[in-house]
Amino acid sequence: MRVTAKADYAVRAAVELAAAGEGPVKGESIADAQEISLRFLESILGELRHAGLVRSQRGADGGYWLARPAAEISVADVIRAVEGPLASVRSEPPEELAYTGSAVPLREVWLALRVNIRAVLESVTLADVVAGRLPAEVTGLLAP
């Protein structure tokens, strides 16, 4: 899996909002804190808003905030909001692939990959990242 700049920035912006708690956070503050282009960030925040993960308010007292508690938003939710499915092969879901001959088992490889990507990204919430406390199923993968 390749994590694009857009997905990385979306997760970082969502983590900034989670760390800020309640109340609006200016886009400029997020952009400065995470060293993200404000223009690109605003586009990403728009996608997160469209997906129902972020709310916004215009004006002097406006800004962005999470639409749900940080403990209810997974890293997978954020990535899906800006990139679509977590794992695809040539833009196709693995279950829709058709291989022939000796390549037939590859379909199961791609399905297993997707299952594991989902397991990690769906188990980590924004609250986990803010707390610096990742689930055991994630930290266990890092053990030597």
Where are these regions (language model features)?
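N-terminal helix-turn-helix DNA-binding core of bacterial DNA-binding proteins
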Residues: 3-37, 64
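Short, hydrophobic-biased segments on the C-terminal half of alpha helices
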Residues: 14, 45-46
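Alpha-helical residues within the helix-turn-helix
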Residues: 32, 49-50
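Beta-hairpin "wing" of winged helix-turn-helix
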Residues: 52-66
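Conserved segment of winged-helix/HTH DNA-binding domains
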Residues: 70-95, 106-107, 111-116
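C-terminal regulatory/oligomerization modules of transcriptional regulators
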Residues: 95-144
